[in-house]
């Protein structure tokens, strides 16, 4: 996907809307998302677009994949497959942030090309003031 292409998914803000969050929580309770469970969700939530329901199901799958790498952040962050493939493990990001602060002190840091923002998150946790910059507008939102 080129940076100028429209995102193939609903905007991250749509995935954070109250109805979408409720549906994400319901999907988290399923051991597996199947075509029949998606059809049931579409039937039970006619006010939500099929594209949004599919995107929420994708988020549930990505959360499962992301949990070993970023822990509980996977439950609340909006994820994207390509960025998830490159994401720094949270424990590694925290270690690096701690080392940076130990050696240089907590100061202002720019994370250019921050992706999902795990390194930025860890730097902020360590006491840094972080400017997180992402070129991809979908990820940046």
Spans of model-derived segments:
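SAM-dependent transferase fold signal centered on methyltransferase-like domains
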Residues: 1-141
